[in-house]
Amino acid sequence: MVAPSGAMSDSESSSSDSSDAEELARCREAATPAWGLEQRPREAERPAAGTADTQAPAPQPSRRREVNQHDEDGNELQTTPEFRAYVAKKLGALLDSSIAIAEVWKKTQQARLQQEAKEQQEAKEQQAAKEEQAAKKEEDGFRLFFTSVPGGHEKEASPRPCRKRQPPSSSEDSDEELQRCREAAVSASDILQESAIHCPAKVEKEAEKKKLKKKAKKKADADLAAATGLEQVKEAGSVNGDPVLSGTKKKKKKKAKKAREASLCPPAECAAAEPKN
């Protein structure tokens, strides 16, 4: 029972190995190029595990035809020699035209580069000429101070003359100007008044006048009070018939009258009138 099973396993393994080898050969044939290149030498295949004694079968030949060996000899389109000559002529003319265009482009590029180089050279020459002229100007003349800048003797542009303002011709403008002048004008009395306000002597005099007025007012009040008291006494004396009280009453009336006059007049006049009395 054991021997037949072992024989069956060996036959199955040999058939599977042969199928694998065929598939590998087909893949290699499909992968190799078919345009006349020689096939690379195949490396020695390593025997798989368990198949050391078995040998791989030889690969089958490829059924694909090679280009160098078919009947048409590369003329797959089956063209005539005249057609091939015509196509070659057209291709040559096309190549010649493209080459000519490239040469013309190169010529124009070279001409443009030469023109740019020429312009740069001219610009450098002009700059050098300007520098030489500036150096000559600096050498001419002398410097008055070490801070003086050379070449500053050129005439500067004269400033534009300012236009004179023409006086207004209409009467309305003249009236407006007169009104403005009146508003801006200041009289001499206003100036003197402002200066007197800020003068300290004037302030002291005003304070003295106020004090004198207060004193005169107090004196007048006292005289009025005395006069009222005398009137009351006179009334009482007239009732009693006393002549002395009537004389004293007259004197007090005179004093009260003088006090009233002094309170009504300004303190400067009162001070001037006191020595006369």
Curated annotation (Swiss-Prot):
Residues annotated as carrying Phosphothreonine in the record are T80
**Principal place of residence:** nucleus
Q: Which UniProt keywords apply?
A: Coiled coil, Developmental protein, Nucleus, Phosphoprotein, Wnt signaling pathway
Query: Which stretches does UniProt call biased (Basic residues)?
Result: 248-258
The listed location of motif Nucleolar localization signal (NLS) is: 249-256
Q: Where are the transmembrane segments?
A: none
Q: Which residues carry this modification: Phosphoserine?
A: S62, S158, S238
Give Gene Ontology CC terms.
nuclear envelope
GO BP terms: namely: negative regulation of Wnt signaling pathway; Spemann organizer formation; Wnt signaling pathway
> Where is composition skewed (Basic and acidic residues) in this entry?
63-72, 115-142
Q: What role is this protein assigned?
A: Plays a role in the regulation of Wnt signaling pathway during early development.
This protein is called: Protein CUSTOS
Q: Which organism is it from?
A: Rattus norvegicus
Source gene? Custos
